[in-house]
Amino acid sequence: MSKVTVIRPKKTFSLNDLKEIWAYKELLYFFAWRDLKVRYKQTAVGVMWAIFQPFMAMVVFSLIFGKLAHMPSDGVPYPIFVYTGLLFWQFFSSSLSDVSNSLILNQAIVTKVYFPRLLLPLAAIATNLVDFFVASIVLVGLMFYYGFLPHIMGLSIIPVLLVISFLASLGGGLFLASINVKYRDVRYILPYFLQMLLFVTPVIYPSSIAGKYAWILSINPMTGVIKAARAAVLGTEPINWFLLELSLLAVAVLIVIGVVMFKKMERYFADII
């Protein structure tokens, strides 16, 4: 007589969930590798699109805001100023979007096979992490071109900034993915939301331009990340640790909300997706 395994849905996130994700780490790798191959399948330049997108955005912003509008850039050349911000913004926004759609894009698997559903959002971010490192090549080139030699201690904070960006996109993405399963409007609204969020994040302008309203920008967790990245890489100013702590606090709230919502809806994914 064959053994029957009953898998009961869990309402809360626990250490066992992390152990389960670790047990399925090879499947996580497979999902990430599959997403990466599908993204650049039948393209002429392949993964180089990861460079092309932020690079062209840098060119357009440099012409419009740097040359025509004479946007201040904290005393550094505008192209490298904006590209540093774009690099982290692209990672965050692409990850948030991909995590939000990760369940519905894999509905055939979700409805048929059991595995930790968190693997799909994590794989989506892992794919964008590869794009981040590829796109970083341009930043290195710009640093050599403009003669920037960042301090080793400054660069050591980059992994921390990546973790904050990772968690911000994961927390927000899990919340949106949970809603997106039932209400597909999310996938249409999100691009417009991200466009608006770009302009309330100091990507194309320094936060100092907001004057007395700069505190509003600090609510955005990516504000602290982007300012710290510029401080670390370009030396525009000392790292604002208080602002970075605010980013961590905002990310912690996002993670709690996202995980709670995801675990609450997880039992219904296969039924309503």
Protein language model annotation of sequence segments:
Residues 1-273:
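Hydrophobic transmembrane alpha-helices and immediately adjacent juxtamembrane helices
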